[in-house]
Amino acid sequence: MAQLMIDIAGTELTAEDKKLLAAPAVNGLILFTRNFASLEQLQELIREARAAAAKPLLIAVDHEGGRVQRFREGFSAIPSMGSLQKIENEDERQRAARDLGWLMAAEVQAVGIDISFAPVLDVDDCSDVIGDRAFSAVPSEISKLASSFIEGMHEAGMACTGKHFPGHGSVQADSHIAIPEDDRTLEQIRAHDLKPFLSLIQKLDGIMPAHVIYPQIDPQPAGFSEFWLQQILRSELQFNGTIFSDDLSMQGATVAGDMEQRAVAALKAGCDMILVCNDRAGAVQVLDADLPATEPESAQRVNRMLMSSNAVSLEELKRTQRWEQAQRWL
């Protein structure tokens, strides 16, 4: 059975939300700023969503830090990963990356959310939509800092997701509103953008491919490409973690057809879980479609992204020495 991650419009579940969450193919929910009014409300929403779901629900958020942090009030203001470059001492930079990875993950899990889609492994090249979301413009520096950040996430008990494979940072167009194309050869991408993914592949629990077309390599965006997902990611890199599609409602995904065609293409290419956000009609269309079944291993991979144990409350977390230690980097 296909695995689908959906979104909801408000701070409470509607009857339609509950019906969709109960659909057998839905086992993921992504939350946005619009779903947050207070810590208490957010935790109640999460409890209700889990109760409504037909099977274990993977709840996710984009909580990278900087300009991409969906929840603010009650949460630490995580700085952008690019701002770590302001720390001149390398050991201190690595310590900051690890502490911030832990802090982000621990706070997000404390309210009942399984994962934040992080870290960004893109190179800070010419993309405004990436920019300071990236650790650096230098692949080797990204690899070092992201490795420490992931260690912090894992210390907190959160699975990590590297994005946007094989690299979104070297195209100017924003795949939310355009269809970016990167005209470089495979050799050029291997020598630059792909390096952080190559070096961190053993640490990554999940990967999210880019809605970017690399026409010298494949006419399909990476998230719909068997070459990128099967030949490179699964076969060559031996990646055995979860592959999440990026949001299928983004403009960069429209080349694959209507929402049903996008879902089919992403699943056939090798995505374990597909995301349909900000398009309720599209989500319903996907649920009503005859989608290709995913292999049993695919469900196991998604289930490995769930929290392994109950996290402490946010209030308890803020009383720990580890939390105090991480605050120095804010």
Curated annotation (Swiss-Prot):
An annotated Gene Ontology molecular function: beta-N-acetylhexosaminidase activity
Q: Per the record's keyword annotation, is Nuclease included, yes or no?
A: no
Q: What is its EC number?
A: 3.2.1.52
Would you tell me the Gene Ontology cellular component terms? cytoplasm
Q: Which reaction does it catalyse?
A: Hydrolysis of terminal non-reducing N-acetyl-D-hexosamine residues in N-acetyl-beta-D-hexosaminides
Q: In which pathway does it act?
A: Cell wall biogenesis; peptidoglycan recycling
EC category name: hydrolase
Q: Family assignment?
A: Belongs to the glycosyl hydrolase 3 family. NagZ subfamily.
Instruction: Relate the protein's function as given in its record.
Output: Plays a role in peptidoglycan recycling by cleaving the terminal beta-1,4-linked N-acetylglucosamine (GlcNAc) from peptide-linked peptidoglycan fragments, giving rise to free GlcNAc, anhydro-N-acetylmuramic acid and anhydro-N-acetylmuramic acid-linked peptides.
Any idea what this protein is called? Beta-hexosaminidase
The gene coding this protein: nagZ
